[in-house]
């Protein structure tokens, strides 16, 4: 199946099965804003859990924080965001729709293999295909404003954070002292960020409200390049370990002229989304932010954010390596890469098309489905009891509606690794049938061994 059609199919599946809904749909919705349904919440939490385990709890040199969405306004002035967190905005004179000029230029270069000789004049209107007629680019702030207090005035002006990183930097000294950490060490944060995107879109890929998984790793100057490469490799491998096909991933080195104001070097992990105007899209960025952030916040706040190395007697401002991932983008990648269609036998002796999400078991929203073969009390009673017992350990779904094959299909398309069928033989042999999602193989497991069997199969879940 072509990748673009996979996007459309996955979007349809997400809406139909309750992973993602359009925000405020009964009122017409908000463009590129999404609510996460019951299964979507579970998938998101599982992704966050795996990220946190890998980046924080499995390491002795990283700790976590949860910082405020609304920071003092001076944080964003000092960091440079108020001045430079802008995008070039242009308007089509054909449709009067607005676009980011850099996105138009990048899409042209990716399609043609070279930048447009005459700049925007060579770029056709994306909607109508007419020869390009554009306004002059204007700076457009990506910061979302809000006001604190009873009056909407300059004194109450604040910003919703466009990244979680600054909350980490301003807490650097607090964390270092209270946790008795010293470089090299990291501080991680998962939370909501907000950006006033000009052209949000592509499902949950680019939205104005999004969730980030970021870690700032503080190192001694001179050791930054080695640590940067370490985190590039580690983050790339994380996606592969959770089931993403490495052929669908690539590393993209930012050209020097396109680096952010704080960056010495940035490498993106990109995924082959195959959007209409671009094959590759950023999944995660790993940046060498140098000592920029701690240095400017030391100057702006008057607080010394340097580190005194007792072993060498030197004082220095740490460099920062930042792996920054978007949770929505990660979720989109895991869904697209897990989506498969194959065939499965039906009750009539033929075969049906089967949609299956071959999600890594650690990510699957539901781990086990308990399915009584019949609604009769002699089966439904023990099945309900079994489901209640298994819920103490995993997210379990209980389903009695429809033929057993149809119920298997429902679980396959949401990625449930195991279906446990309670049948009439269970009443005689105290065993159940366990079906594995990907192979569709079925084995008989005694009830008193079921929990242990599933625990072995669901390690890390």
Swiss-Prot record:
GO-annotated cellular components: cytoplasm
InterPro entries in the cross-refs: aa-tRNA-synt_IIb (IPR002314), aa-tRNA-synth_II (IPR006195), aa-tRNA-synth_II/BPL/LPL (IPR045864), Anticodon-bd (IPR004154), Anticodon-bd_dom_sf (IPR036621), Gly-tRNA_synthase/POLG2 (IPR027031), Gly_tRNA_ligase_bac (IPR022961), GlyRS-like_core (IPR033731)
EC top class, as a word: ligase
Family matches, as PROSITE patterns: AA_TRNA_LIGASE_II
GO molecular function, one term: ATP binding
Catalytic reactions on record: tRNA(Gly) + glycine + ATP = glycyl-tRNA(Gly) + AMP + diphosphate
Biological process according to GO: glycyl-tRNA aminoacylation
Residues holding substrate: 100, 163, 210-214, 322-326
EC id: 6.1.1.14
Stored SUPFAM superfamilies: Class II aaRS ABD-related (SSF52954), Class II aaRS and biotin synthetases (SSF55681)
Functional description taken from the UniProt entry: Catalyzes the attachment of glycine to tRNA(Gly).
HAMAP family: Gly_tRNA_synth_B
Family classification: Belongs to the class-II aminoacyl-tRNA synthetase family.
Protein name: Glycine--tRNA ligase
Organism listed in the record: Corynebacterium efficiens (strain DSM 44549 / YS-314 / AJ 12310 / JCM 11189 / NBRC 100395)
Gene that encodes it: glyQS
């Amino acid at each position: 199946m072509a990748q673009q059609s996979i996007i459309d199919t996955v979007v349809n599946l997400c809406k139909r099965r309750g992973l993602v809904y359009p925000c405020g749909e009964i009122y017409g919705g908000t463009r590129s804003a999404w609510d996460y349904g019951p299964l979507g919440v579970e998938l998101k939490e599982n992704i966050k859990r795996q990220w946190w385990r890998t980046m924080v709890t499995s390491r002795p040199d990283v700790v976590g924080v949860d910082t405020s969405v609304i920071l003092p306004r001076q944080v964003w002035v000092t960091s440079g965001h108020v001045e430079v967190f802008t995008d070039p905005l242009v308007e089509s004179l054909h449709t009067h729709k607005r676009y980011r000029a850099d996105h138009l230029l990048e899409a042209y270069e990716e399609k043609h293999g070279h930048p447009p000789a005459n700049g925007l004049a060579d770029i056709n209107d994306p909607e109508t295909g007419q020869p390009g007629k554009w306004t002059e680019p204007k700076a457009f702030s990506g910061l979302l404003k809000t006001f604190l207090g009873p009056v909407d005035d300059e004194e109450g002006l604040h910003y919703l954070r466009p990244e979680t990183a600054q909350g980490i930097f301003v807490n650097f000294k607090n964390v270092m002292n209270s946790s008795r950490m010293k470089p090299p060490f990291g501080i991680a944060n998962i939370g909501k960020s907000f950006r006033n995107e000009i052209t949000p879109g592509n499902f949950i890929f680019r939205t104005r409200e999004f969730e980030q998984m970021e870690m700032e790793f503080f190192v001694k100057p001179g050791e930054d390049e080695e640590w940067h490469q370490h985190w590039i490799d580690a983050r790339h491998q994380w996606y592969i370990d959770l089931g993403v096909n490495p052929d669908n991933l690539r590393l993209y080195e930012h050209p020097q002229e396109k680096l952010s104001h704080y960056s010495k070097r940035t490498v993106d992990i990109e995924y082959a989304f195959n959007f209409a105007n671009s094959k590759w899209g950023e999944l995660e960025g790993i940046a060498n932010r140098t000592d920029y952030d701690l240095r400017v916040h030391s100057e702006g706040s008057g607080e010394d954010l340097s580190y005194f190395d007792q072993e060498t007697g030197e004082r220095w401002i740490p460099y920062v390596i930042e792996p920054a991932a978007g949770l929505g983008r990660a979720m989109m990648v895991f869904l697209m890469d897990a989506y498969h269609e194959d065939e499965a036998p039906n009750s009539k002796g033929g075969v049906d098309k089967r949609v299956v999400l071959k999600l890594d078991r650690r990510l699957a929203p539901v781990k086990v489905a308990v399915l009584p073969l019949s609604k009769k009390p002699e089966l439904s009673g023990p099945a309900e009891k079994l489901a209640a017992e298994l819920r103490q350990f995993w997210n379990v779904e209980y389903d009695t509606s429809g033929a057993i094959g149809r119920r298997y299909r429902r679980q396959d398309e949401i990625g449930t690794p195991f279906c446990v069928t309670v049948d009439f033989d269970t009443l005689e042999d105290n065993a159940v049938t366990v079906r594995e999602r990907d192979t569709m193989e079925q084995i008989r497991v005694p009830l008193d061994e079921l929990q242990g069997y599933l625990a072995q199969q669901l390690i890390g879940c």
